[in-house]
């Protein structure tokens, strides 16, 4: 049965998130879920229900753990939670029904990314790496045997997926990668490493880019994509990285020492990996833009109620004009970002995928999320600066989106070059 039926057929009832305890003078009611006006956002009834269903689930099962996950840099129940996401049908949200997917679009994918990130941006990032960077790449580029072998377990949550592209000296300049894949009989032998790999310590299945021709000119012609399993001989992971933000979304270095990968595990064709890579980047940037949306909404969830509980000079601080200005700035940034992201997602669902706007949505939402997080800290004053409140976590998490998946500088280059190409 299609998982879309499981996902969208649930009855949605109203709920209210239990407020997080505060150790200070602000009452516990200071945190509540703010309503999202999806009539303005242009969502249909199924999309509204999708948001409500996922929001209810993650606010009950993930949000109360978000601070602990951040502080310990560990999500102890990751595997169990992943299977719950699988049972909801959201891990393979864009995958075909025949493999257990929900067969929905990129707008729905963004909505789920947003709501998970609203509860925990770190877990939202891991979800994006699994559902888009890994699953969607196999859906778009895998052959039938690969899809039948890998997709069902990735979609159910039995397996965790990742994508490995970056290296210590090949981040934005990804085609300069040095991970080498040499063909020997019916296998390829991989030697080298990958770095900053989201889900790396946990992944069972990884989409890995390697050089099958180190002398190719241009260098992009020598790249091949492989599907690598964690138990393949010669593959290992280094210790988990201790990051500024997105803590609990596990990241590490991957090590390939004479790692044997069957030739049957080539994703697409030999030396055609750059096409897999570049076509996937546009949709990666779009889906990941849901992360900053969720962070901004979480900031508002904590900030707006706080401003109407905290008192100074004999009145609620939300009554001061400067604080009203902060509220207006945060809200309008979020709403402008939502409209841009949702409209680009709709266009992609209709087959109109543009690198310029996929880069644009992650550029704009990432930088707005950082500013909204800073504004939220300012609104809470001293409480915003201590770790009893989550405001610092929002800022640290938001900053990742200006760096990961292509930096803000690279996104500006993508947009600028697109305009220049129109005038050649």
Curated annotation (Swiss-Prot):
Its cofactor is FAD. Substrate binds at residues 172, 220-221, 275, 282-285, 405-406. It is an enzyme of class 1 (oxidoreductase). This is Isovaleryl-CoA dehydrogenase, mitochondrial. Belongs to the acyl-CoA dehydrogenase family. One of its GO terms (biological process) is L-leucine catabolic process. GO terms for cellular component: mitochondrial matrix; mitochondrial membrane; mitochondrion; nucleoplasm.
């Amino acid at each position: 049965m299609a998982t879309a039926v499981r996902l969208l057929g649930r009855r949605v009832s109203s709920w209210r998130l239990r407020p997080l305890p505060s150790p200070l003078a602000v009452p516990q009611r200071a945190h509540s879920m703010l309503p999202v006006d999806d009539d303005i956002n242009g969502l249909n009834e199924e999309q509204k229900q999708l948001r409500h269903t996922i929001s209810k689930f993650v606010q009950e099962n993930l949000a109360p753990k978000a601070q602990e996950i951040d502080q310990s840099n560990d999500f102890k129940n990751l595997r169990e939670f992943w299977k719950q996401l699988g049972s909801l049908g959201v891990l393979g949200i864009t995958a075909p029904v025949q493999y257990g997917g929900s067969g929905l679009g990129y707008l729905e994918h963004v909505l789920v990314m947003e709501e998970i990130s609203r509860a925990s941006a770190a877990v939202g990032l891991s979800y994006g790496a699994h559902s888009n960077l890994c699953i969607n790449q196999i859906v778009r580029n895998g052959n039938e045997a690969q899809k039948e072998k890998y997709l069902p377990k990735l979609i159910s949550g039995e397996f965790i997926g990742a994508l490995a592209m970056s290296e210590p000296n090949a981040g934005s300049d990804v085609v300069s990668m040095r991970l080498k894949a040499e063909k020997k009989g019916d296998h390829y032998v991989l030697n080298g490493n990958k770095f900053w790999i989201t889900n790396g310590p946990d992944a069972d299945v990884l989409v890995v880019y390697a050089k099958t021709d180190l002398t190719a000119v241009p260098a992009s012609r020598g790249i091949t994509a492989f599907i690598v399993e964690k138990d393949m001989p010669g593959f290992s992971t280094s210790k988990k990285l201790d990051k500024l933000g997105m803590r609990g979304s596990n990241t590490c270095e991957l090590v390939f020492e004479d790692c044997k990968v069957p030739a049957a595990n080539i994703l697409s064709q030999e030396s055609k990996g750059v096409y897999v890579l570049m076509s996937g980047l546009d949709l990666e940037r779009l889906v990941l833009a849901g992360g900053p949306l969720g962070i901004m909404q979480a900031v508002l969830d904590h900030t707006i109620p706080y401003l109407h509980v905290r008192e100074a000079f004999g009145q609620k601080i939300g009554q001061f004009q400067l604080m009203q200005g902060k509220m207006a700035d945060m809200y309008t940034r979020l709403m402008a970002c939502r409209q841009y992201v949702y409209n680009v997602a709709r266009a992609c669902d209709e087959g109109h995928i543009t690198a310029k706007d996929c880069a644009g949505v992650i550029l704009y939402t990432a930088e707005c999320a950082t500013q909204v997080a800073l504004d939220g800290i300012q609104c809470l004053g001293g409480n915003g600066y201590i770790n009893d409140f989550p405001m610092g976590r929002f800022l640290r998490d938001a900053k990742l989106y200006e760096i990961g998946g292509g930096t803000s500088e690279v996104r500006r280059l993508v947009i600028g070059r697109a305009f220049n190409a129109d005038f050649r």
